[in-house]
Amino acid sequence: MASGDDSPIFEDDESPLCSLEKMTDLVAVWDVALSDGVHKIEFEHGTTSGKRVVYVDGKEEIRREWMFKLVGKETFFVGAAKTKATINIDAISGFAYEYTLEIDGKSLKKYMENRSKTTNTWVLHLDGEELRVVLEKDTMDVWCNGQRMETAGEFVDDGTETHFSVGNHDCYIKAVSSGKRREGIIHTLIVDNREIPELTQ
């Protein structure tokens, strides 16, 4: 079983039963939030067969059979930006194993902490659809449900506005100074002249 800060989230009742039947050696599941969406990473480790299988969003990325060395690592890529991910397999005692996930060379926990400083995320419902809007603060790229949006920047009296459209809805992210050095710039999503609360991660 997995342990540590980067331990997986185990299968819940919402997952289809057929995927559990198919994945008989499923040992770890992680949900990873990237700019283009939340990706589910599943790992099968057959400690008697030597099998290792990595699935990203239900699609098989890596399959290795008859691996005689049961510890090691598997490296693959996740999401539209091809973010590097590595699953580390370590023996902790006897036939017990620990599975940890690294994203861009950092533990999942450290990566998510860093990401919360470099991105803002909003979730809202528009026209009966759930939308996930992500602002990458370092590049000012805006993503909506996995698509990088066409944007137009505009300077205004109290800061900047980054405009984009979702369907027939006018949206913009307003950036204003907090006036406090430690807080920095405050980003606010406005959709149809309505402020959307930020998702806290």
Curated annotation (Swiss-Prot):
User: Which cellular compartments is it found in?
Assistant: Cytoplasm
Cite the InterPro entries for this sequence: FAIM1, FAIM1_dom_sf
Query: Carries keyword Transferase?
Result: no
Cystine residue pairs: none
A GO CC term? cytoplasm
Q: Does the keyword Cell division apply?
A: no
Keywords on record: Apoptosis, Cytoplasm
Give the main localization category: cytoplasm
- Biological role: Plays a role as an inducible effector molecule that mediates Fas resistance produced by surface Ig engagement in B cells.
Q: What is this protein called?
A: Fas apoptotic inhibitory molecule 1
Q: Which organism is it from?
A: Rattus norvegicus (Rat)
Source species taxonomy? Eukaryota, Metazoa, Chordata, Craniata, Vertebrata
